[in-house]
Amino acid sequence: MAAKFHLCLLLIILGTITVQGARHPGKPHFFRRQPGSDCASINGRCVPPNERCPNGECHLQSCPGYQEKCCCPV
């Protein structure tokens, strides 16, 4: 009886972890907002220069890292 209970509890925990991972796919870590910048004021995102901007690059020089560019908002 205890083995069935432990197995059931394990399945519930694994199911919860799986659902939590599926619920938060999120954006890649390199997409981030920089509060107070011109890029953030237009809802853009600062990304490393080697990453592709899905909607094109907004040519703003306000990303704090000198090696970052601003991606236009969706």
Swiss-Prot record:
GO terms for MF: toxin activity
Compartment annotation: Secreted; Nematocyst
Superkingdom of the source species: Eukaryota
GO cellular component terms given for this protein: extracellular region; nematocyst
PTM description: Contains 4 disulfide bonds.
Transmembrane regions: none
Keywords per UniProt: Cleavage on pair of basic residues, Disulfide bond, Nematocyst, Neurotoxin, Secreted, Signal, Toxin
Chief location of this protein within or outside the cell: secreted
Propeptide: 22-31
Signal peptide per UniProt: 1-21
Its biological purpose: Induces neurotoxic symptoms on zebrafish. Has also been claimed to be implied in calcification, but tests on homolog proteins suggest that proteins of this family have a neurotoxic function and not a calcification function.
Protein family: Belongs to the Cnidaria small cysteine-rich protein (SCRiP) family. beta subfamily.
Protein name: Small cysteine-rich protein 8
Species of the source: Orbicella faveolata (Mountainous star coral)
